[in-house]
């Protein structure tokens, strides 16, 4: 049996029912990860299930949504401006920086960096944004102030993607991530304008096509952020729903898999198809 973790969270209270499902409950093919989880946050509150939602997984690039949430919080407080231009050099560029590498001469605004970090998963953009808030520890402190005492960021891109077994650095638990994401997207932590901006960036994600988006029926809404790391790690956090509007938050992480990247993408797409079928 493979371990799955799913949590369903109402808009005001968290309810969890723990259970184990056989592998045949989800139509997965070519799967052999040591760990795989699903985290489902249901604002409608009709289905309440969880599968071991309190085990740590590497966040990988899914942390970039939390980072931009922290940046927007500073904007709301008058401590930052989305239009502020940040200049950087060749020495600042790290692996996988498809947007920032094109703007060495003119720099990028904070708004443009957040867009690059979320929609293209640009690693240099994330590091530059981390610098604006004071580094990984300050992002962790921001999350603690939100009530999330689980999620932590310790390193910068790309080292945070190592995904070493039993290493708590740069990890979260599915329940914590779903609750924190819901607070950022629907709570009072950010202004309405900032909440809308965050979900707009996620809706414009350009690198998660083979995952949940590939399983969506016509007319469904999705705003998401994927992540990939070492040691077979893959993940996605998303707000999605029918009729063109989000109604649930889904968080899926896997690590320790021997599957190829394409196989891991198919795993997540197939999980998404099962969730949608039983919506």
Predicted segments — roles?
Residues 127-186:
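Mid-domain, small-residue-enriched loop/turn segments at the edges of structured enzyme/sensor domains
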Residues 77-102:
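Short, glycine/proline-biased beta-turn/loop segments that scaffold the active-site neighborhood
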Residues 22-30, 47-48, 55, 131-132, ...:
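Structured C-terminal helix/loop/strand segments within mature extracytoplasmic catalytic/sensor domains
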Residues 50-53, 109-112, 120-125, 157-165, ...:
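Flexible glycine/proline-enriched surface loops and loop-helix/loop-strand junctions
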């Amino acid at each position: 049996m493979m371990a799955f973790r799913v949590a369903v969270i109402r808009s005001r209270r968290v309810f969890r029912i723990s259970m184990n499902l056989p592998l045949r409950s989800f139509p997965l093919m070519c799967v052999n990860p040591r760990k795989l989880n699903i985290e489902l946050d249901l604002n409608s509150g009709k289905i309440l299930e969880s599968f071991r939602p309190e085990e740590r997984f590497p966040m990988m690039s899914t942390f970039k949504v939390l980072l931009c949430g922290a940046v927007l919080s500073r904007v709301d407080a008058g401590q930052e401006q989305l239009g502020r231009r940040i200049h950087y050099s060749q020495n600042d560029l790290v692996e996988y920086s498809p947007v920032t590498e094109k703007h060495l001469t003119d720099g990028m605004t904070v708004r443009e960096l957040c867009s690059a970090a979320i929609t293209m998963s640009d690693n240099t953009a994330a590091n530059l944004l981390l610098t604006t808030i004071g580094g990984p520890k300050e992002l962790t402190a921001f999350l603690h102030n939100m009530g999330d005492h689980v999620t932590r960021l310790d390193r910068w891109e790309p080292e945070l993607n190592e995904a070493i077994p039993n290493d708590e650095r740069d990890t979260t638990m599915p329940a914590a991530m779903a609750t924190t994401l819901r607070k950022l997207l629907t709570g009072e932590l950010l202004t309405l304008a900032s909440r809308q901006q965050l979900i707009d960036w996620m809706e414009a994600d350009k690198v998660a096509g083979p995952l949940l988006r590939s399983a969506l029926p016509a007319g469904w809404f999705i705003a998401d952020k994927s992540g990939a790391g070492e040691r077979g790690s893959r993940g996605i956090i998303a707000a999605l729903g029918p009729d063109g509007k989000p109604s649930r938050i889904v968080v899926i992480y896997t690590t320790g898999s021997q599957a190829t990247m394409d196989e891991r993408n198919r795993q997540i797409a197939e999980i998404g198809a099962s969730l949608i079928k039983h919506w």
